[in-house]
Amino acid sequence: MEQWRQCGRWLIDCKVLPPNHRVVWPSAVVFDLAQALRDGVLLCQLLHNLSPGSIDLKDINFRPQMSQFLCLKNIRTFLKVCHDKFGLRNSELFDPFDLFDVRDFGKVISAVSRLSLHSIAQSKGIRPFPSEETAENDDDVYRSLEELADEHDLGEDIYDCVPCEDEGDDIYEDIIKVEVQQPMKMGMTEDDKRSCCLLEIQETEAKYYRTLEDIEKNYMGPLRLVLSPADMAAVFINLEDLIKVHHSFLRAIDVSMMAGGSTLAKVFLEFKERLLIYGEYCSHMEHAQSTLNQLLASREDFRQKVEECTLRVQDGKFKLQDLLVVPMQRVLKYHLLLKELLSHSADRPERQQLKEALEAMQDLAMYINEVKRDKETLKKISEFQCSIENLQVKLEEFGRPKIDGELKVRSIVNHTKQDRYLFLFDKVVIVCKRKGYSYELKEVIELLFHKMTDDPMHNKDIKKWSYGFYLIHLQGKQGFQFFCKTEDMKRKWMEQFEMAMSNIKPDKANANHHSFQMYTFDKTTNCKACKMFLRGTFYQGYLCTRCGVGAHKECLEVIPPCKMSSPADVDAPGAGPGPKMVAVQNYHGNPAPPGKPVLTFQTGDVIELLRGDPDSPWWEGRLVQTRKSGYFPSSSVKPCPVDGRPPTGRPPSREIDYTAYPWFAGNMERQQTDNLLKSHASGTYLIRERPAEAERFAISIKFNDEVKHIKVVEKDSWIHITEAKKFESLLELVEYYQCHSLKESFKQLDTTLKFPYKSRERTTSRASSRSPASCASYNFSFLSPQGLSFAPQAPSAPFWSVFTPRVIGTAVARYNFAARDMRELSLREGDVVKIYSRIGGDQGWWKGETNGRIGWFPSTYVEEEGVQ
């Protein structure tokens, strides 16, 4: 058996991998194991399992997500503990990039093998590896893994549970189970079932409250004698406040039950705000467990005291660590209990109030999960902060991190391509130079003042680090070009940039005359539209800077009109439109209106005036064509003619007839173009139409025995092949590049547009058509590993092959949801969602597909079909 397979089985024996992990499937390949280990989480978990306490769980980033920084930090933590605690020499270990980039996976396997032979591992009774029957010459199987790593993501199941929390639900069931509860039987009436549900809510709440009292009486009281106030607060968090709330909560439930339970929904609605304190408890739970474990390991007096206390609670059946998990599990059960009660209350007069109570507890669960998630995010941001030199601002002010990693960066001004490490946040991209394990700050680029555009070059360059895109300043200042290692990496970075920009500049930010900005709310705030919480601890939603209301991203378009807008801002029923103006010059936002949103336009655009003081240099208006509103210089417009039509200007490029020009080929497919131009001399070119594509025109040119294709972008009445140089017409563009080399835009295309194809004599007969495989393709495609087919796979196929996920259910979206992250799935009310995974359901997230996209979505935002 190959050594990597033995390694996988050993990790299963160490309870690091589950018994049915894909590494033991017959179809498994070595990359399956490499991919499982690349983020360092499982290796750190391995050390914890072999020697509890050898590694501080606080040092592990259990959800590194899209962060190279956090993955490498995990790997370095593993290597340090192997050296310091297990005594492995540096020569017996590996470089972090040997694993992260899978440069030398053989060294990783060798290091894990040495751990398996260590006396600590041997004491567990687990057979080490390799065994004598190891297959020889494993080196061949490790080749090409680095290329596979370039093409495949790390695992992104970011909403599942942290490994050390998996048993929490079982602990809850053991502690809170109610022995007197009878299972529902066949033949029971709906009233009987409803009574069972009511009884379960009451009795489990009573059992839970007794558990809280046990913790207070038998642990908190005695341990105050041996712990400092700071340690007490770290271990028990705000448990005293929880106990006070649940004393009142249980009394209210009991009173409702004495009246038949018809007012139980009202009780939950009344206590929703008071239960928000669970956000603090749950977000500090991990730190509390870590502090408790450290105290138990470092202080013998404390350990003995805890053992004495444990014997007083249910005969020592549960440890303090177990009991501290129960509050987090309990608060996330309320919506499940109410959902079951609602399903047996079809004809009850309080049904509507029960629905409202269910939604309230679902909202509470989502709020608590997001607070916990934000605490983890802030921890990651703090680690970034400590690693970047010369950083004078708090990174958390820039929103949530999206992605980080190594790119090459070139300033559009000086054209020097440099190796840089980027941290992308919602608001900025931090550009750094890597210095060992730290980073030197080079640039902070504010995304609000930039737009991203693709490098329009069609052809793939076979060299790495040649896949580029632009970040262009909206006011013509310095821009940047970024280069990625692979096309897939470029796609991921561009998607994350798009998501970040949509967070700080959402499409509906000015809907109904509001002026919404992403904002951190100091107090718990409800969305003005849906009335649900704005969730988390920072940048929870959007604040209107005019009227002060808060909203979710997905609710911006349905917020009632802004109350602080002037009458001219609102389309009053029956009121006529404001005076129309026509733009007499282009305005792209420079100069910018002080503290106001910008309205950009082109010469000839018609603008409806919303607010305009004759003595003011700035007016507010709305473009008639797009309905977009904002501020602009009053000197850039003049009154429109009475009929409302703008003066005659130049016709758009789509209305110009280019057929007389010797370079215009009309409608022509890419393959046909290749066949036509390959027999011509270098520098021969044509312009062709692409009617089925978003960009209508493309330049095709023969250069160094290859045909290159460049799309021509038409946007905002300008036409260009690169953002750095724009033209008013296609003819102007062609005339420019007849005299200037394309190298200005594309480094490897050092040629002008020399010979229009119609004016050149054919020099040779056409060669036979190229095969499809030989044609350059701009579309993303997988690089198929040798020996693997990407045809439909059997259930045992490697997880990184192309496959159709198994649908385990369907649901209908009850609310709109706007993704804040590329891993999330946006929903519109009424969308039918295919459910692929409920892993992470206790964290509030399911995985599914709708509208052609796959991602994670809040489980409480959908109603599962076929489930009563």
UniProtKB/Swiss-Prot annotation:
Residues 400-502 form the PH domain. GO terms for molecular function: epidermal growth factor receptor binding; guanyl-nucleotide exchange factor activity; phosphotyrosine residue binding; zinc ion binding. One of its GO terms (biological process) is angiogenesis. Residues 663-757 form the SH2 domain. InterPro entries: CAMSAP-like_CH_dom (IPR022613), CH_dom (IPR001715), CH_dom_sf (IPR036872), DBL_dom_sf (IPR035899), DH_dom (IPR000219), GDS_CDC24_CS (IPR001331), PE/DAG-bd (IPR002219), PH-like_dom_sf (IPR011993). Pfam families: C1_1, CAMSAP_CH, PH, RhoGEF, SH2, SH3_2. The modification Phosphotyrosine is found at residues 142, 159, 172. Residues 1-120 form the Calponin-homology (CH) domain. Keywords: Angiogenesis, Guanine-nucleotide releasing factor, Metal-binding, Phosphoprotein, Repeat, SH2 domain, SH3 domain, Zinc, Zinc-finger. Interacts (via SH2 domains) with the phosphorylated form of EPHA2. Interacts with NEK3 and PRLR and this interaction is prolactin-dependent. Interacts with SSX2IP. This is Guanine nucleotide exchange factor VAV2. It comes from Mus musculus (Mouse). The gene is Vav2.
